Each structure stands twice: as structure tokens, then as C-alpha cells.
């Protein structure tokens, strides 16, 4: 069944993660396939290790500046810039400056489940190195892998 979805500014389910707050805005499932839409509000932090996910993603920068690292190539992205990350491609990003706000669109319906599991399993108030066992458990459950790992 096709239905219209309207989400007001500030609405959505929040998934606090080590690289920022991932806010689920919409999940669409119809005869043409599935995709999910997230707003990501990311603070300046060290770049997380590149990771590989089973879904493709589009990162559209709304505010701030990021450096996206996709398959070994670095992209300096400014507001209005867009990076497409194919499924199975190592990728990560770092905020340049104080913070950034992105619109992320992912193929399929797995990213939301991954974000929910990660947010519920990995503490955001400690360094990623200290949570590596939890991170690896969550990534393993969702077909996500650290690049080179």
C-alpha cells in the first residue's frame, strides 16, 4: 500500500551513535523497493574507521562541512554537496568545524534496524576503542564490517 508520509521539522526517532544523532525520518516500502531517510546531526570528532554496509547510501550535506572517505578517495563536501556510497564500499566521514547536518538516504530497510541496535548497545559517552566488543557484535548482526577487519 502506498501512503504519503509527512514529518515535521524536529520529528523522528533519534538514534544517538558515536558519530552523531541519526534521526529516522521515513521508511518507504512499496512494489518498487524500499529506502530509508535519516537526518544526521554530527559533532566534530575523530574520523571513525571506514566500514562496509550491505546498503547503498546517499549523503547530502545540509549544513557545515565534512570530509567523506569513500573507497580510499577523500571528498571535501560543502552544503549542497552530495556523495553516493555504493553498497559494499568502505566509507566514513569526519566533520570539519564544529558540527554538520546531513540528509542520508539508504537503500533497503536495514540501516534503521542497524542504527537502533547500535544506539541501544554502544555507549556514546566513551571512546569507540573502549566499546569495540559491542561495536563488533552489532555490526556482525547486521552485515556491516569494519574495512580491513
What are these regions (language model features)?
Residues 1-34, 125-149:
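A short, N-terminal "cap"/entry segment at the start of jelly-roll beta-barrel domains
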Residues 8-9, 65, 72-90:
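Short acidic-glycine-tyrosine-enriched beta hairpin
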Residues 31, 67, 87-112:
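Ligand-binding loop in jelly-roll beta-barrel domains
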